[in-house]
Amino acid sequence: MFPLTEENKHVAQLLLNTGTCPRCIFRFCGVDFHAPYKLPYKELLNELQKFLETEKDELILEVMNPPPKKIRLQELEDSIDNLSQNGEGRISVSHVGSTASKNSNLNVCNVCLGILQEFCEKDFIKKVCQKVEASGFEFTSLVFSVSFPPQLSVREHAAWLLVKQEMGKQSLSLGRDDIVQLKEAYKWITHPLFSEELGVPIDGKSLFEVSVVFAHPETVEDCHFLAAICPDCFKPAKNKQSVFTRMAVMKALNKIKEEDFLKQFPCPPNSPKAVCAVLEIECAHGAVFVAGRYNKYSRNLPQTPWIIDGERKLESSVEELISDHLLAVFKAESFNFSSSGREDVDVRTLGNGRPFAIELVNPHRVHFTSQEIKELQQKINNSSNKIQVRDLQLVTREAIGHMKEGEEEKTKTYSALIWTNKAIQKKDIEFLNDIKDLKIDQKTPLRVLHRRPLAVRARVIHFMETQYVDEHHFRLHLKTQAGTYIKEFVHGDFGRTKPNIGSLMNVTADILELDVESVDVDWPPALDD
């Protein structure tokens, strides 16, 4: 059943004769169910022409001050003269515009610039799908997004003013919200075709996105007059190649007075010579996240690449030893590494290890069995004796928040080998065992002042346990609040950490070795070996 009614004929004939395609006509007539839009374009045009052939009265078009004045005004004057000689007093729509309705299938829509014509047909859908299949991405669903030229909003505004005026003659109204949005109509037509061609559902929450960007160089200046009338709407923004974004154009159209618009832009809009061009067809997959715990056994390995003034100081890092394997297997473009704290280059991380997470950006492969992840973990562990990884698993973006939760409240356990300048006996260190929840103030250490703001941070040493080695050495086991600088707690950092081991013992103390024994974060979940 054809979706238009007798009430729509006036508007449909008007739009068709001024160069508007059938699908845009449906939009302006408020057709909000999908089926009619999905008909093949030629069939749709034939059905529309059949529907309009039953119209008995010619429609009157009152052209609203179009800029290409000389051509169209001359056409109108000639039409009026011819009609007056025949004793008729009305202007036929068929005399206005460059195209009669029967030839509309040869012309580009003056509103959508071909978007709802050529780019809704199966040939174009197949072209996009071929690009998707050649991209090499794994996906079980997709979200399809399009970017239309901003001048489409200007053209739609002009067509709306035209239709609104004509409907006003019949005491009818047409609000902007009554028009079906171009993107909505485009989705109604294309989504089922994409889903059928690729064999997967269209899902707005899918991590795999196919995006198509359209442009129309021929009409790119359609928006420019708005900048002169509404300059506040068009301000340069970072990462934007043009000030004429869709949002800026819509803001200006909502602000501009109708009479000002009509002085500057043809109504109805001119028919273009060519359809839109496809600037790009891109595929991208949302990031996936891998988490685990790592042990670091080397005292000559930084957590992240150590590069100063463009020069690499050490050949590798914990981050690289793990991420290189993940990048290769997930076929990702890049990654972001994060962890629950960090250790210095000369500090080992023992026990159950330190929690970490890696964000893999735009991965092409995303589906793995638990066995495949276990094999990947083994591959990482076999590749180096400097680190080991455990509990490797895929996690969600939201789950990574657990790693950072309670950053100040969580605790860490350390083991340090201490040197003292004065000779000591076992009894000289035993009093440290009795100290509980010692509060200290730490001014930002000198060694990190270049990358951390100057501040005094209150920290807590929950307990200490000593182990005598010889008259100048003892081992100190301690549990502290996360974020405590252990080296500075031992040597005092020139008095910037108070109290410290040196001040408590009334000696000069320094730290020779430091190991992280545990990071007390219950994440990620432990896995069976």
UniProtKB/Swiss-Prot annotation:
Positions with a binding annotation for Zn(2+)? 21, 24, 109, 112
Any coiled-coil regions, as ranges? 42-89
Region feature RNA binding thumb loop, mapped onto this chain:
442-457
Q: How is it modified after translation?
A: Proteolytically cleaved during TRAIL-induced cell death. Cleaved, in vitro, either by caspase-3 (CASP3) or caspase-8 (CASP8).
Mutating residue 344 to A leads to what result? Abolished tRNA pseudouridine synthase without affecting ability to promote miRNA processing
Alphabetically sorted, this entry's keywords are:
Coiled coil, Cytoplasm, Isomerase, Metal-binding, Mitochondrion, Nucleus, Phosphoprotein, tRNA processing, Zinc
The biological process GO terms on file are: primary miRNA processing; tRNA pseudouridine synthesis
Where Phosphoserine occurs along the chain?
Answer: 79, 84
Q: What does this protein do?
A: Protein with different functions depending on its subcellular location: involved in miRNA processing in the nucleus and acts as a tRNA pseudouridylate synthase in the cytoplasm. In the cytoplasm, acts as a pseudouridylate synthase by catalyzing synthesis of pseudouridine(54) and pseudouridine(55) from uracil-54 and uracil-55, respectively, in the psi GC loop of a subset of tRNAs. tRNA pseudouridylate synthase activity is enhanced by the presence of 1-methyladenosine at position 53-61 of tRNAs. Does not show tRNA pseudouridylate synthase activity in the nucleus.
Fill in the subunit field for this protein.
Interacts with components of the microprocessor complex DROSHA and DGCR8.
Name the record gives this protein: tRNA pseudouridine synthase Pus10
- The organism encoding this protein is Homo sapiens
